[in-house]
């Protein structure tokens, strides 16, 4: 398969993971998609662009190239459900709105999907694990920020309009509570934006698996409402007029994350 990810090593103890901005499809997935799925509506559009200041902060960055329709990097390899409510699995068969992803009988075979696990999912998670280990060895701790976005209205997944900033810490298990409180305070002070901590999106597999505060690895997921930086309808254009202020809040969140780490591990 083609190159499956982009990784850039930084100089501070922070890794920003971007598992869902990819738009590449495998031939088997491409051949089977229903017409309405071809717009790749459920993509976390423009996330690398939204976070392109990460290099200035010194953060390491990791971004996936393949679409979540191929394999969802934020699900466990055994596909154990993460939420009791409606969700999508390791190998999605439905769109976020509940409609089928594939034409009847056209989903990739089990053998094909095992290849996606080996060639797309595994390298991404190997990179996370290796980089967190490197950061912890160098600094004594590591910080993981899992960057996501989603349409602000998806009735099949949640009621009403999603808050703008959705912080997830696996109900407090993936990071120090003092860190979560500091990040929530940043969101609360961000004029014109709504937020929630551990609401509908508490953190997917990446946050839950790698966040081990007792081992000095602190993980936080941000699920961002896409209306804060882009058009939510095709062709899903990036809106610099909206994104500028949103990026400023994200940057403040990441700077606060780094500052907390310096203070906690001084």
From Swiss-Prot:
This is N-formylglutamate deformylase. Catalyzes the hydrolysis of N-formyl-L-glutamate to formate and L-glutamate. Shows weak activity with N-formyl-L-glutamine. It catalyses: N-formyl-L-glutamate + H2O = formate + L-glutamate. Keywords: Histidine metabolism, Hydrolase. It is an enzyme of class 3 (hydrolase). Monomer. Signal peptide: none annotated. The lineage of its organism: Bacteria, Pseudomonadati, Pseudomonadota, Gammaproteobacteria, Pseudomonadales. The gene is hutG. The keyword Methyltransferase does not apply. GO terms for biological process: L-histidine catabolic process; L-histidine catabolic process to glutamate and formamide; L-histidine catabolic process to glutamate and formate. Coiled coil: none annotated. There appear to be two competing pathways for the degradation of N-formimino-L-glutamate in P.aeruginosa: the two-step degradation of N-formimino-L-glutamate to ammonia, formate and L-glutamate (via HutF and HutG), and the direct hydrolysis of the formimino functional group of N-formimino-L-glutamate to produce formamide and L-glutamate (via PA3175). Belongs to the N-formylglutamate deformylase family. Pathway: Amino-acid degradation; L-histidine degradation into L-glutamate; L-glutamate from N-formimidoyl-L-glutamate (deiminase route): step 2/2. InterPro entries: HutG_amidohyd, N-FG_amidohydro. Its EC number is 3.5.1.68. One of its GO terms (molecular function) is N-formylglutamate deformylase activity.
């Amino acid at each position: 398969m083609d190159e499956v990810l982009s990784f850039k090593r930084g100089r501070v103890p922070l890794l920003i993971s971007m598992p869902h901005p990819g738009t590449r499809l495998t031939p088997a997935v491409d051949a089977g998609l229903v017409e309405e799925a071809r717009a790749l509506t459920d993509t976390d559009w423009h996330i690398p662009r939204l976070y392109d200041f990460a290099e200035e902060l010194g953060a390491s960055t990791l971004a996936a190239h393949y679409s979540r329709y191929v394999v969802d990097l934020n699900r466990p390899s055994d596909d154990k459900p993460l939420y009791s409510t409606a969700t999508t699995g390791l190998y999605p068969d439905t769109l976020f709105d509940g409609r089928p992803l594939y034409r009847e009988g056209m989903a990739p075979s089990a053998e094909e999907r095992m290849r996606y696990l080996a060639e797309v999912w595994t390298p991404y998670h190997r990179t996370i694990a290796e980089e967190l280990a490197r950061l912890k060895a160098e600094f004594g701790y590591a910080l993981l920020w899992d960057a996501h976005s989603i349409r602000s209205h998806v009735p099949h997944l949640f009621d009403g309009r999603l808050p703008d900033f959705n912080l997830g810490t696996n109900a407090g298990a993936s990071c120090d509570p003092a860190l979560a409180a500091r990040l929530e305070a940043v969101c609360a002070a961000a004029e014109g934006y709504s937020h929630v901590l551990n609401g509908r999106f508490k953190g997917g597999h990446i946050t839950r698996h790698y966040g081990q505060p007792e081992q000095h690895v602190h993980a936080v997921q941000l699920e961002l409402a896409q209306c804060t930086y882009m058009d939510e309808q095709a062709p899903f254009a990036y809106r610099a007029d909206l994104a500028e202020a949103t990026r400023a809040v994200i940057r403040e969140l990441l700077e606060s994350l780094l500052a907390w780490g310096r203070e906690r591990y001084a």
